[in-house]
Amino acid sequence: MNAHVIDAFDEIVLAFLKTRTGMEVSEYLDFNIGSLVNYIGRDPKELMEKADLYFLNPATFFPAEVKESAENFWGLELGSLERYQDELTAVTKLVPHHNFTAFRKRPFFRTNGTCIAIHPCFVQEKLEAGLFWTIFHTLQHDTERDALFRLWGRLFETYIIETLAAAAKGKNQFLPFPKYRDNNQEAFDGILSDGKICVAFECKAGFLKAESKFSEDPKLLIPDLEDKFGSSKSGALRQIASNITQVFNKNRTQRREIDGLDLSKVHVVVPILVVQEKFVSSPLTAYFLADSFRSELRKQRLVRDIDCQCPSLVVMDAYDVEALRVSNSNSAFDLLNCVFERSRLGDQVYDFHEFLIDYAKVKGISLKSDSVMDGKIKAIFERISERFFHRPVSDNAEQAI
């Protein structure tokens, strides 16, 4: 990951979390994983037959050596009946049976000296978008929150593009954060090309409002989708369409060239939108965004027409991108061919991950974790073991035997 991005994140955002909660980000994540292991490390049948295993004692669950950090962690994660009641009965635009915000904030319910996870999924979410909101809720000023949104967006872009580069490695040409030759401004977040087919990637880490997702009211959802991801001035679809018409202008004398990449013989450009929220990449919202992109491209072409084909917009999320990287450990996988095949299917109500599963079956590709992913997971658990037990995971396993 780019050093300047991590430095900015360390200096600004991590300082907020450490100062106001007493925990560093890696420490907070380790405690979340440690508590989550109690549930995912067991057979569901065992939890159903022995309900007491579902309860944790906040005072003793983590080792005594990390007591202060454990208290800080539980201070963020424990919810009470009174707190839940206040939040769940507050007047909002959310449909009550979709309103789990209180449980997402504090996924452990305090009960007479012990606690119970409302649902392990709420704990797991703290390792994803929940981390953002945990940091967000520690911030006190709009300037701090704005800084967090900008930095989180840049981190998301950087992570996705690095992962896509790994998914494309060994085949075709992938250019991260390509810039226009005339002014050195960024054109797309990433470009993949074989000289004839080009894939243009745009990443968007924005969050939809809770009322947009959970009110069951299209009048709230659609404007929010358009504003953050669609054809608004800062919307991702408008950016993609505008840059496509500039790079592939039918009037070749007015084309804007990408530095370090020859696209003069490209006859097909595939637009890809990578989002953070699964809600945005879900089949119905992806279909809406694909249709919205088609309309936006038509408007842009009235000003600058293009001389290449532009099939359907493909919408995917971070989970899909990680699956694409794993797929590239198989020699039969080709990222450009994969997304081109999905784009050729048109604006269908078809989840990208479902498509990828079908595509992998046809190509004989495994979507299971590979050695790279296994190595990263092992490194995380080694770090957790050192934090809580001051020894490697292998030593813990030997003692258990």
Where is each model-derived feature located?
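Short secondary-structure boundary/capping segments
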Residues: 215-219, 285-293
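Short, internal active-site loops enriched in acidic
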Residues: 267-268, 274-281
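Catalytic cores of nucleic-acid endonucleases
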Residues: 205-270
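Interfaces and regulatory segments of ATP-dependent nucleotide/adenylate/phosphodiester-chemistry enzymes
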Residues: 1-167, 288-401
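Conserved structured core elements
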Residues: 150, 154-158, 181-184, 234-241, ...
